[in-house]
Curated annotation (Swiss-Prot):
This is Ran-binding protein 3. The gene is Ranbp3. Phosphorylation at Ser-58 promotes its import into the nucleus. It comes from the Eukaryota. It comes from Mus musculus. Signal peptide: none annotated. Its main location: cytoplasm. Keywords: Acetylation, Cytoplasm, Nucleus, Phosphoprotein, Protein transport, Transport. SUPFAM superfamilies: PH domain-like. The modification Phosphothreonine is found at residue 56.
Length: 491
């Protein structure tokens, strides 16, 4: 190859100079800017600045001095070609265009090309190997090299090609798949296919990274696809979990457990007597292990229920021999002499009862009043003939009655509705009048009858008085007659 380059160099050299001058003013579509190209060269660590741009930094000068033979792809050359006034700098400029196959392209431009279009391709990676133009072997590059340099290039290429070839072939296959994927892209169209494609690409990238751990593989993230895959996984996971549990299923097995029943039975046996505990333990042993919910609940309530059976007691109120005539809801007041005011005793049911007397069978009545709720006795008095009763107002009656607390006669006020007050007043008035008439009759019956001798003496005395009066009258009349007789004789 060195001999071939030496033979073609004088024939092709002028055309190469003219071709690079015209080519230097055009930029490839894959490159973004001269600054971006220079940054990529800096990141690669093999940057060789052109002579036209004068750098003042020490880094560029040190790199320019220490730079030897460097392999750079011709697609990464940016900027204009050197002017025609500097022909001596042309060989150094031509050192950047080196014969290099497509499999040996640097990986760093691929990372830059993926970061820019990632937002537009919806996460589908487009490596720089696919977008950038493929390098071709030009005879001009061979003509610009010296025989020693071309020999060194061939030696280095032979050493580096076997190391990069497997990875390069995988990248070429991966590039062809990714070129077919983003063609005619519409947002949201065939989203499932893209998910599958990304999964396949990820698997291929994993295989490549496992084969070549030193190579840098870009990771394209698409949040829409991640959300769809995570939601699908969650849906399947929730569906699997929902089929496992059903509410209310096998409730008897969950509620009924033999240890808990034994504990409950032991508690009840402690509270009950020894005889009851023995009977319950025998019944539990005879009972089957698995019972229904209703049966177990009935057995539990029966075991824990305390049957408090009270003896029936006959209620005695003292009104068993009486007949109720009238009962009303009212409020009772008592007159306090010290404070000269009415004090409430309580409210409840006032009953008017009639009863037969044991002595002579006469009718007697009494008033009984108990408080509502507690049934405490607050009034218990009999009706008598000298009992005073008057109607204080349309809804109240004032009576005198015996007090059950101090057994003295006090003045009470009964307050109720107008209808109940009228009925009570009429019933009390009728019974009090009957008691008064009966009392008068008793008094007349109890008075002693007059004696017969005494009546005769009185009659004789009366007759004597009449006789005494009669002679005096007669004598008076005789004298009068005598006077009359004397008078005419005298005349």
């Amino acid at each position: 190859m060195a001999d071939l380059a030496n033979e073609e160099k004088p024939a092709v050299a002028p055309s190469v100079f003219v071709f690079q001058k015209d080519k230097g003013q055009k930029r490839s579509a894959g490159s973004s800017s001269p600054e971006a190209g220079e940054d990529s060269d800096h990141e690669d660590g093999n940057y060789c600045p052109p002579v036209k741009r004068e750098r003042t930094s020490s880094l560029t000068h040190s790199e320019e001095k220490s730079s030897g033979f460097r392999l750079k792809p011709p697609t990464l050359i940016h900027g204009q070609a050197p002017s025609a006034g500097l022909p001596s700098q042309k060989p150094r400029e031509q050192q950047r265009g080196v014969l290099r196959p497509a499999v040996l392209q640097a990986p760093q431009p691929k990372v830059l090309s993926q970061t820019v279009p990632s937002s537009g391709t919806n996460g589908v990676s487009m490596p720089a190997d696919c977008t950038g133009p493929a390098t071709s072997v030009s005879p001009e590059n061979l003509t610009q090299r010296s025989p020693s340099e071309s020999a060194e290039e061939t030696h280095t290429l032979e050493e580096k090609v076997p190391q990069k070839t497997p990875h390069g072939t995988s990248e070429e296959g991966h590039c062809e798949e990714e070129q077919a994927a983003p063609q005619a892209f519409v947002f949201g169209q065939n989203l499932r296919d893209r998910v599958k494609l990304m999964n396949e690409n990820a698997s291929v990238a994993d295989v490549d990274s496992a084969a070549h751990p030193s190579s840098e593989t870009p990771s394209a993230t698409n949040y829409f696809l991640q959300y769809i895959s995570s939601s699908a996984d969650n849906a399947t996971h929730s569906a699997d979990n929902s089929t496992k549990f059903v509410f209310g299923q096998n409730m008897s097995e969950r509620v009924l457990s033999p240890p808990k029943l034994n504990e409950a039975n032991s508690d009840t046996s402690r509270e009950t007597t020894h005889a009851q505990s023995g009977s319950e333990s025998s019944s539990q042993e005879a009972a089957p292990k698995k019972e229904s919910l209703a049966e177990s609940a009935a057995a539990y309530t029966k075991a824990t229920a305390w049957t408090c059976l009270l003896e029936k007691v006959e209620v005695i109120t003292g009104e068993e021999a009486e007949s109720n005539v009238l009962q009303i809801q009212c409020k009772l007041f008592v007159f306090d002499k010290t404070s000269q005011s009415w004090v409430e005793r309580g409210r409840g049911l006032l009953r008017l009862n009639d009863m037969a007397s044991t002595d002579d069978g006469t009718l007697q009545s009494r008033l009984v009043m108990r408080t509502q709720g507690s049934l405490r006795l607050i009034l218990n008095t009999k009706l008598w003939a000298q009992m005073q009763m008057d109607k204080a107002s349309e809804k109240s009656i004032r009576i005198t009655a015996t007090d059950a607390e101090d057994q003295g006669v006090k003045v009470f006020l009964i307050s109720a509705s107008s209808k109940d007050t009228g009925q009570l007043y009429a019933a009390l008035h009728h019974r009090i009048l009957a008691l008064r008439s009966r009392a008068e009759q008793e008094q007349e019956a109890k008075a002693p009858p007059p004696e017969p001798g005494a009546t005769r003496a009185t009659e004789e005395e009366d007759s004597d008085e009449d006789a005494v009066l009669a002679p005096s009258g007669v004598t008076g009349a005789g004298t009068g007659d005598e006077g009359d007789g004397q008078a005419p004789g005298s005349t």
